[in-house]
């Protein structure tokens, strides 16, 4: 609720609170926030799934430009989002991307997918890249540099991530993502350090200058994302992509900066997102 108040005060978005009115009022009072300052759309019951469905209805109708998870569980919101007939599915697979500001990296760095797709196969990785590259372009990255991350830099038939990386690079060469530089497989060290790539004798346009890292699976992505935050001192904004509207999935441990940055990113993505 404090994040909602900050978002409104800073003019980033016009918050619409969705749920049972009494629950919203009590949450606002506990946070010291005047709920009357916001538009409230009441759901029919205290069941969080009713609030999720109402939010999806508003998004389908074009009455809201983005969704942000409040006090309900992620699966309660996402079940409504991915509903086959009444959800927010669009042309591509739904995925997630973080955009990081890291103290020791020279520019913003995106990671995908660290939240939604557990063990993506090749077609899923293609869609994850499609969504994340589109997000980068809304941020002004005209020619994204993408590293497909694996444990090793060479294609190894025993490591599926390296085979997928090789296939994605070949797909990029057909123009699948337009003017984007896609390289892989890259070890994480090579992807973020030109010096590491030089020592290993690699020639790369991406090493040390990546805009986006495609992680091999959710385990690797989620651990790297949390390492960036809790050890690396990074701040991040994250979005669910590939739905009709961008979706902010907050965690209880997220910083206020991360929450506000995610909403700002959602507004940018929404403005640059083609109509469904």
Briefly describe each language-model feature range.
Residues 1-206, 211-276:
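Anion-binding alpha/beta catalytic cores of soluble intermediary-metabolism enzymes, centered on
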